[in-house]
Design a protein with these regions (language model features):
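Conserved glycine-rich Rossmann-like NAD(P)H-binding loop of the short-chain dehydrogenase/reductase
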Residues: 30-46
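Conserved NAD(P)H cofactor-binding loop of Rossmann-fold oxidoreductase domains
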Residues: 92-97, 236-237
Length: 241
């Protein structure tokens, strides 16, 4: 049977890093096929599909709200049906909001944990079961230098969610080995957050260089055979300060 190329599911693919991953990876390997998850960015995803399809790249959209955690198993099955399998899962979708620790409500905490930690956990659980059966698969979790190596004031619930995702990466890499490799990427200050009232990005690094390095790191992990349980900091050394 002819190999149809790796099938890659990217969550939060319509904007920011997710969008750049689609654009970058589609240039590196024309055989990749993409499942593009979105929630509120249908126009952006369709525009992205139109753009890469001009180069012969196949991509299919799928809408889902990760706050509906009880429906993630159904979402995973629907995503797998689009091409018949998923070879690579990239957990990229996340919420980034500032709020003082003593002002965080139960709803604030639940939403942050549901989208940034619980959703990747459940999605990885359901999709990896098929990967294990096929004895092949990759999972890449996008964490953050915030919550992994350092913390920011007023972002406690965000830091907790990303720190938990980093720990989850290591646990999954042990439990799913040797057939599924699980790694994480922890970007630094790359793209200014949307609607952020905090002036945290005065000294953020060259976005183009950072995005290129992130895309190349993802490509390395997609194609690697012997990298498992690692966290790749792509932050120009920011986490050392």
């Amino acid at each position: 049977m002819k190999d149809i190329g790796k099938i890659i599911l990217i969550t939060g693919s319509g904007r920011r890093i997710g969008k750049e991953l689609v654009l970058g990876l589609s240039k590196i390997d024309k055989n990749y096929k993409f499942i593009l998850h979105y929630n509120n960015s249908s126009k952006e995803v369709q525009s992205l599909i139109n753009k890469i399809s001009k180069d012969g790249i196949s991509a299919k959209p799928i809408k889902f709200n990760f706050l509906e955690t009880e429906k993630i198993e159904s979402f995973a099955h629907e995503a797998e049906k689009l091409y018949g399998r998923i070879d690579v899962l990239i957990n990229n979708a996340s919420i980034f909001k500032a709020k003082k620790f003593n002002k965080i409500s139960n709803k604030d905490l639940d939403e942050m944990i549901d989208v940034n930690l619980k959703a990747p956990f459940l999605l990885s659980k359901f999709i990896s079961s098929q990967m294990v059966k096929r004895k092949n698969g990759k999972i890449i979790n996008f964490t953050d230098s915030i919550g992994v190596t350092k913390t920011w004031k007023d972002y406690s619930h965000y830091c907790i969610s990303k720190g938990g995702l980093e720990t989850m990466t290591k646990v999954m890499s042990l439990e799913l080995a040797p057939y599924v490799q699980v790694n994480s990427i922890a970007p630094g200050k790359i793209l200014k957050p949307i609607n952020s009232s905090k002036n945290l990005y005065n000294n953020f690094y060259n976005s183009n260089d950072a995005i290129n390095d992130i895309v190349n790191t993802v490509y390395l992990l997609v194609e690697s055979k012997f990298i498992n349980g690692e966290s790749f900091k792509v932050d120009n050394g920011e986490s050392l300060t």
